[in-house]
């Protein structure tokens, strides 16, 4: 007996979702998001307790697929988590190229990270990254204020880099700030 999901999947096959093999459904490549159509996951999303990691994995997979749009793998935000974990971006990209899922990548990171952390350390770091705002130097504060102003003239609640990234993602895909 087929489950409801299997029946639904079978009833909604189209030529673009079926394999060249007769009767075999083709699975969409959900591992490589199209970041020209939607943003990567939130910087607040967690994988293994790590903030930023799911977002960076989305950008890495999209980069490999050529669907990264305006998003850049190994940008300064990504470099924060790469530094904390102690993983070289090229090696992570090579693992993503193998088609590994999030869980497999997390296992690889845990096995290969130069910097091993206790769960409480990872949680504190991730909480800090969620709350991290611009540094107090005038140049950074000005950049932050101008960047937020380009996105919205009315949003006074945008205080952290995570806030800015989420707002930018929202506005970039048609949202009203």
Language model region names:
Residues 68-109:
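Amphipathic alpha-helical packing elements
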Residues 92, 96-152:
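Amphipathic protein-protein interaction modules
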Residues 19-26:
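Long, low-complexity intrinsically disordered regions enriched in Ser/Thr, Asp/Glu, Pro/Gly
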């Amino acid at each position: 007996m087929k489950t409801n999901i299997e029946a639904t999947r079978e009833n909604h096959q189209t030529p673009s979702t079926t394999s060249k093999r007769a009767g075999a459904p083709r699975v969409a490549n959900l591992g490589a998001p199209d970041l020209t159509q939607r943003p990567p996951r939130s910087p607040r999303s967690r994988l293994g307790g790590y903030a930023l990691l799911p977002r960076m994995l989305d950008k890495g997979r999209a980069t490999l697929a050529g669907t990264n749009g305006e998003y850049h793998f190994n940008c300064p935000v990504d470099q924060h988590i790469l530094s904390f974990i102690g993983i070289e971006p090229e090696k992570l990209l090579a693992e993503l190229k193998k088609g590994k899922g999030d869980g497999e990548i997390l296992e690889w990171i845990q096995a290969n990270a130069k910097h091993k952390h206790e769960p409480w350390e990872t949680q504190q770091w991730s909480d800090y990254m969620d709350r991290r705002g611009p540094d107090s130097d005038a140049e950074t504060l000005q950049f932050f204020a101008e960047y937020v102003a380009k996105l919205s003239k009315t949003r006074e609640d945008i205080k952290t880099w995570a806030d800015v990234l989420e707002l930018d993602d929202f506005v970039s895909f048609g949202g009203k700030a």
